[in-house]
Amino acid sequence: MQPATDTIAAIATAPGQAGVGIVRVSGPRAMAIARTMLGFEPKPRYAHYGPFRDRQGELIDEGIGLYFPNPHSFTGEDVFELQGHGGTVILDILLREVCSLGARLARPGEFSERAFLNDKLDLAQAEAIADLIESSSEQAARCAVRSMQGVFSKRVDNLVEAITHLRIYVEAAIDFPEEEIDFLADGKVASDLQGLLEQVQQILGEAQQGTILRDGMKVVIAGRPNAGKSSLLNALAGREAAIVTAIEGTTRDVLREHIHIDGMPLHIIDTAGLRDSPDEVEQIGIARAWEEIRQADRILLMVDATTTDKTEPHEIWPDFIDQLPRSAPVTVIRNKVDLSGEPLGISAESHQTAPVIRLAAKAAEGLEVLREHLKECIGFASTTEGGFLARRRHLDALERARDSLLQGQTQLEGYGAGELLAEDLRAAQDALGEITGHLTPDELLGKIFSSFCIGK
């Protein structure tokens, strides 16, 4: 992508009526538009209160005009803002007048795109702006601000720099064999490579938490009919989201509730009871339940504690466990312990294949233990000091970088192949470069910025 040469404009505030509405202009004609609508040439970075007029001198509105010359603006271009009254009609009139003076309507995210193209921010920072706007909790907002300030980008850049230094050392040994640099003998390359792997794994772990904080953790409640799945959904949601009866098969479709636990967003999904059923509608619900189960970040296997004393998933329901993906994380929920006489709490002994939580969903007893467990499942701390938000594409890039480094380690240890190691280091660099936008295809850039709201 090349920096733009035309002038764009958009309403930068949310649609609807409000006390203040903003029309934003960016590009080479920003000053000319400002001069026409204010009636004078505004002083840079000063708030000028007065009338906004059209080309014929007719009054449109009055408010504050702000002018920011390049490169000291959000986009890196000349920027002019009209801050007037927030009515839909008046903002549309202002925008039409601005466009008649040589601007065009901005595409979604085009202001942030221009800031990226003019090196005012990198791609991860630009995405953080959209994440800040869309944040669903205070902690997500705070982490988005840190990403916007470059906390995540700096970590990635430092890692890329370290890979670059190691790559230079390895390629020097390849290109200048007469210097007799033996990068196997002193262990420097192996040590540095291991350090890089530890760094990328640490960043990946933090990015996984940031992704869950942004997107939410998908928790699916599964089990046989009448195990108490809907009662648990209601208890966690704090309302009667699902109908609860003693009739088996009451829940026939997927029910979703979005909740927060100490700022962590969770998508709690209640599913139809799993069984062989001749009922066509129930069969559809069960099929949908399996779709959700296979995509879950955490599966809560609900067990009626009054019907069995088993705690191992394979012993409780071998057919169910055999159908799960191998990596599917399962927590056994022994429900109705107020009837079975078992104590509330959690047991997660080393010999257990899955944690076991004992609670009484209908009586809302033992829920705090479950909430704490869900936080621990993703390594979520009550504080997000130093944390950042991340996206799925960031995880993919970090995983590819890690895999390239692991492959390079194999080449080094198994064959002493410097050429192959150098290529793996380059692949890791390229993957990390996609995060900040240094090596990102134009098609992906367009897709990312088009998901932003207009005016950003």
Curated annotation (Swiss-Prot):
Taxonomy, superkingdom: Bacteria
Cofactor: K(+)
GO MF terms held by the record: GTP binding; GTPase activity; metal ion binding
Binding site for GTP: 226-231, 245-251, 270-273
UniProt entry tagged with the keyword Ribonucleoprotein: no
Signal sequence region: none
Keywords recorded for this protein, A-Z: Cytoplasm, GTP-binding, Hydrolase, Magnesium, Metal-binding, Nucleotide-binding, Potassium, tRNA processing
GO biological process: tRNA methylation; tRNA wobble uridine modification
Binding-site positions, K(+): N226, T245, I247, T250
Coarse class of the protein's main subcellular location: cytoplasm
GO cellular component: cytosol
Subcellular location: Cytoplasm
Annotated disulfide bonds: none
Entry note: cofactor: Binds 1 potassium ion per subunit.
Residues where Mg(2+) binds: S230, T251
Keyword tRNA processing among UniProt keywords: yes
NCBIfam families: mnmE_trmE_thdF (TIGR00450), PRK05291.1-3 (NF003661), small_GTP (TIGR00231)
Record's subunit section: Homodimer. Heterotetramer of two MnmE and two MnmG subunits.
The protein's role, per its UniProt record: Exhibits a very high intrinsic GTPase hydrolysis rate. Involved in the addition of a carboxymethylaminomethyl (cmnm) group at the wobble position (U34) of certain tRNAs, forming tRNA-cmnm(5)s(2)U34.
Family indicated by similarity: Belongs to the TRAFAC class TrmE-Era-EngA-EngB-Septin-like GTPase superfamily. TrmE GTPase family.
Designated name of the protein: tRNA modification GTPase MnmE
Organism the protein comes from: Marinobacter nauticus (strain ATCC 700491 / DSM 11845 / VT8)
Gene name per UniProt: mnmE
